[in-house]
């Protein structure tokens, strides 16, 4: 538990030198196999910072090492979005979540690999090369926060931040056997997150158990005047309402049949096994229809690609970022900068988004997608008024082999079937490990009603006690 690490650092049972040295020994041994980082900070700098931060006796994370996804701005530390166009970009400011981490004494060890601009489900679209799953080096760790998932499963650090636009925290959590939370939209500031799709994405915590997940979420959540989409909440009341002891006998869970039917047999078997255990503990489970499931992926990708084409228009290689150099014609220079600076998947989504937003297609596609999103949100809200949670496998498949889906966009997009619904509805969703198939982790996803984040984490604590799957580290 992270609280034990903090206590050991503060009372001197664990010295900063030993703590950091052991971590860098793991990096030396494991990182060359999994490639979870894009940038790793200097060891002596980290030791000095840990020493300084443990003097902060009140810091919840005093001296704790944490890995940050490389689309979250970090003052003085390269932030690339795993793209050539931002290969040498160093932000002049910290994201709000990074400020909050530092205020509690956390130390950023480095920036994790990801799909380029968070566009992908396997961490194979990174300009810096793919990350490999610590449980099987021939397989993907999921995406787009694959580096953050792999760095936990590889045993390098205990905490990481990711971002989730359509499942980008939960997919790597499932494929790496760790915990990940996509928070309620507006509960965590997006200031400093390099945008992909503003209306869908959230920064969220990743950890190896529910207790540490809650601690990290508690640090990063809260209103921020620099992000107008954040909401004002009484954090203590919000936490108290969700953290009170959950009596499993009073819990009602809905399973969406339409989603479950699309899952592979090993995934379904692990999912049914944990449901049986929950039923034996007194949980009530109903299988219900969700006829809008078939429209979730098309609506999600239409909205996400449209927002991406707008957000990424700012990257032209003139003011900052990769430049192919001015050749006398600005139009050609812009085109060359973007053509060489962006990868194939990013260019695909920009072009599709531009097409969707063009005259004649805007109402036919984009407006219809927004209407479908509203219908999905209303239906999810209706279900969550009758049930405490909605359960599904996090991913419909086991981790695919590297190269298996990245060359087939439709196959890659279909991996997000179970996860995009929470982003469209703006509700919190959590993934945690519930089993293995051929040494490959399988995850359970739970969705809760808006602002039920702490309640979601609390039920996760109950489930990890029942399943015994937590604090997992791959034997690598």
Swiss-Prot record:
Molecular function terms, GO-annotated: ATP binding; glutaminyl-tRNA synthase (glutamine-hydrolyzing) activity
Annotated active site: 69 (charge relay system), 144 (charge relay system), 168 (acyl-ester intermediate)
Top EC class for this record: ligase
Organism: Sulfolobus acidocaldarius (strain ATCC 33909 / DSM 639 / JCM 8929 / NBRC 15157 / NCIMB 11770)
EC number(s) from the headed UniProt entry: 6.3.5.7
Family per similarity comment: Belongs to the amidase family. GatA subfamily.
UniProt keyword terms in alphabetical order: ATP-binding, Ligase, Nucleotide-binding, Protein biosynthesis
Keyword hit for Ion transport: no
Protein name: Glutamyl-tRNA(Gln) amidotransferase subunit A
GO biological process entries: translation
Superkingdom to which the source organism belongs: Archaea
Gene Ontology CC terms: glutamyl-tRNA(Gln) amidotransferase complex
Function text: Allows the formation of correctly charged Gln-tRNA(Gln) through the transamidation of misacylated Glu-tRNA(Gln) in organisms which lack glutaminyl-tRNA synthetase. The reaction takes place in the presence of glutamine and ATP through an activated gamma-phospho-Glu-tRNA(Gln).
């Amino acid at each position: 538990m992270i609280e034990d690490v903090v206590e050991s650092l503060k009372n001197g049972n664990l010295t900063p030198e030993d703590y950091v040295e052991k971590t860098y020994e793991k990096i030396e041994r494991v990182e060359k196999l999994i490639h979870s980082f894009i940038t790793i900070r200097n060891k002596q700098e980290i030791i000095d910072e840990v020493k300084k931060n443990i003097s902060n006796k009140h810091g919840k994370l005093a001296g704790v090492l944490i890995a940050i996804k490389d689309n979250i701005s970090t003052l003085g530390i390269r932030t690339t979005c795993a793209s050539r166009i931002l290969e040498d970009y160093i932000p002049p400011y910290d994201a709000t979540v990074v400020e909050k981490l530092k205020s509690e004494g956390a130390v950023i060890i480095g920036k994790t690999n990801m799909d380029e601009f968070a566009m992908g489900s396997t961490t194979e679209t990174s300009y810096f090369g793919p990350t490999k799953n610590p449980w099987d080096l021939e397989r993907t760790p999921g995406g787009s926060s694959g580096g953050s998932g792999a760095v936990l499963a590889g045993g390098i650090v205990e905490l990481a931040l990711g971002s989730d636009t359509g499942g980008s925290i939960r997919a790597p959590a499932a494929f790496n056997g760790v915990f990940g939370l996509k928070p309620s939209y507006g509960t965590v500031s997006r200031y400093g997150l390099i945008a992909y799709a503003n209306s869908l994405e959230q920064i969220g915590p990743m950890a190896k158990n529910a207790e540490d997940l809650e601690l990290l979420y508690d640090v990063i959540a809260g209103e921020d005047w620099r992000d107008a989409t954040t909401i004002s909440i009484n954090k203590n009341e919000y936490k108290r309402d969700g953290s009170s002891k959950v009596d499993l006998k009073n819990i009602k869970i809905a399973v969406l049949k339409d989603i479950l039917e699309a899952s592979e047999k090993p995934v379904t078997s692990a999912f049914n096994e944990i449901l049986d255990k929950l039923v034996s503990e007194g949980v009530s489970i109903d299988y219900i229809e969700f006829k809008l499931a078939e429209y979730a992926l098309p609506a999600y990708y239409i909205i996400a690609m449209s927002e991406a084409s707008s957000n990424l228009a700012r990257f032209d290689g003139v003011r900052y970022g990769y430049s192919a150099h001015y050749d006398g014609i600005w139009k050609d220079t812009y085109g060359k900068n973007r053509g060489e600076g962006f990868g194939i998947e990013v260019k695909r989504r920009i072009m599709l988004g531009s097409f969707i937003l063009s005259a004649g297609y805007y109402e036919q596609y984009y407006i219809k997608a927004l209407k479908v999103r509203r219908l999905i949100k209303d239906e999810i809200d209706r279900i969550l008024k009758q049930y405490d949670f909605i359960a599904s496998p996090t991913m419909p498949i086991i981790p695919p082999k590297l190269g298996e889906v990245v060359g087939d966009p439709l196959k890659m997009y279909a991996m997000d079937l179970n996860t995009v619904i929470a982003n469209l509805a703006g509700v919190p969703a959590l993934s945690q490990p519930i089993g293995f198939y051929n040494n490959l982790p399988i995850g359970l996803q739970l969705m809760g009603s808006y602002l039920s984040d702490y309640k979601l984490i609390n039920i996760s604590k109950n489930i990890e006690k029942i399943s015994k799957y937590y604090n997992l580290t791959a034997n690598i």
